[in-house]
Amino acid sequence: MLNTGRCGSTTFIKACQHISNYTSSHESLLNKTGQQRLNYPDNHIEADNRLSWFLGQLDKKYSDDAVYVHLKRERQAVAESFSKRIDFGILKAYEQGILLHAEHRLCAFDIAVDYIDTINANIELFLKDKTHKIDVSVETVTTDFPRFWKMIGAQGDLDEAIKEWSINYNAS
């Protein structure tokens, strides 16, 4: 599952844990590199916002043979959440490692918006020729998640999965 982060990926995996014919994890291969970084088992759902930096490798390994989910949340809400995390994590890495700002040159919100727009554009470009893809939006999750459930032929307790979306996991 591809995403920017701060958009419900932890909740998505909590919901997927009510699927009995798939395994699911959140950022399970963070300590791996190379081919091992994307070595997920069959019938597995993985949420990791860092996958957006491995799209070329992801395409080589899975091509159009996987179901790709683009998890989204309203841009303003994601940017506000990321703004509170400017001094650590992926936003700090983006500001200092990609933009090469040794110190805060822009406000945290503007850096977050740039990061979000960049990551979403990269994901959209990656997905443009994929046939097994679905967008899931936090704002419309009660209709989007059941479509995802049906698309993958999930078995389990959909009602309990939907209930997970009423809980704020990993909030900031």
What is the meaning of each model-derived region?
Residues L38-Y40, F109, T131, Y169:
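Short, solvent-exposed coil/turn segments
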